Amino acid sequence: RLALPPGAVCNGHKSDCQCFGAKYKCSCPFFWRFRKSAECHCKKGWAWTAIKKRSCHNRYQWSD
């Protein structure tokens, strides 16, 4: 499966590797686990997001 583009709905239970690019993470709203309608999205993270994502197995899919 290809990585999800920025703004796409992602699975908050999985790692940030599902989102495209080193700087993007799966961001979920506050108390998302308790709200049925809450969705997580791939959004730009902080500097340490890129550091944390260095070990992702699907890095070859990213261009940045």
Curated annotation (Swiss-Prot):
Keywords: Disulfide bond, Ion channel impairing toxin, Neurotoxin, Potassium channel impairing toxin, Secreted, Toxin, Voltage-gated potassium channel impairing toxin
Domain of life from the UniProt record: Eukaryota
Gene Ontology molecular function terms on file: potassium channel regulator activity; toxin activity
Organism: Oculicosa supermirabilis (Central Asian wolf-spider)
Family the entry assigns: Belongs to the neurotoxin 04 (omega-agtx) family. 01 (type I omega-agtx) subfamily.
Cystine residue pairs: 10-26, 17-56, 19-42, 28-40
Full protein name: Kappa-lycotoxin-Os1a
UniProt subcellular location: Secreted
